[in-house]
Amino acid sequence: MDKRATKQVLITGGAGYVGQVLLDGLPNNWKATVIDNVYGGNNNFHPSENIKFVEGDIRNESLMEKLIAENDAVIHLAGIVGDSCPNNPKSAQKINVDATEKIAKFCNQAGKRLVFMSTCSVYGFNEKTCNEETEPNPLNAYSNHKVLGENIIKDNSDNYLIFRMGTVYGWSPRMRFDLGINLFIEKSLWKEEIHVYGGNQWRPVIHVKDAAQALVMAVEDSTLNTTLNLVGKNHLILDLAKQISDNIKVVDYKDDNRSYKVDNSRILEKLKWRPIMDINSAKSEFQKVNYQEDIYYNKRWNYE
């Protein structure tokens, strides 16, 4: 039995892709409260003795203030991602930016630790390897919101850790196939052709289990107040596809100019975190599902 003091942790967006993997590996001494509005539906989330579920919206200020006061730390995962931001501009601003500001202020007022999930997409396009001191260059609404969120937290919180997460992949109870590597692997199971758009763009990648482990470590080490790149190795997108399948078609694509390599030396040194998963180990987790269903694609949901 784990005899460490019980830690109460609030997880926003905890019924989502990263959140459910985090909950699957919850430390024995943690009791989690999940707040999630389960956009798009989710039949795979199951509360337990150590996991309390609150179906609610992070824009509800009185609810958020109450939940934050009841917990020791907050892991802030909730947000509108990717193409859903320009498709739902009003909600994206209120959820990604305005609600994040309130959460940061409530955490600071109550003396709670805040762990925020940002994205390496804030680097946009950069031919040099980016570290945490590299000037952000957001090229879309989502990454711009994350830059704003980071700045808000640094301005309003005394006890925080910001992760800039790389391109995430891996199996989750709340699966997503609007993530490129996941779609590549799933299509390979069905023996289908993989379309690679461009392919010469660089991406730092991170398995969702490794990301979840970093979140746990960020809460446990409450002395570390900084920004960390949460990434494993850097890959060209075409090279990633070739690791997964031989059935590849390269498609000319100019709508996404992002390309960035990212240095992870700070997280290795400061948090003592190490990634353990890779593309090959991820492939064994996948199962054949109807990957074209709307539930697997956040951008198909209406948030307004």
Regions found by a protein language model. Name each.
Residues 9-28:
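N-terminal Rossmann NAD(P)H-binding glycine-rich loop of SDR-like oxidoreductase domains
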Residues 58-95:
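NAD(P)H-binding glycine-rich loop region in Rossmannoid oxidoreductase-like domains
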Residues 74, 87-114:
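NAD(P)-cofactor binding segment of oxidoreductase domains
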Residues 101-141:
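Conserved Rossmann-fold NAD(P)-dependent oxidoreductase catalytic core, especially the SDR/UDP-sugar
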Residues 119, 150-172:
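Conserved beta-loop-beta element that borders a ligand/cofactor-binding pocket
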Residues 123-124, 140, 163-179:
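Flexible, glycine-rich beta-alpha linker
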Residues 145:
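Active-site helix of classical SDR
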Residues 192, 197-304:
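C-terminal substrate-binding subdomain of Rossmann-fold SDR/epimerase-dehydratase oxidoreductases
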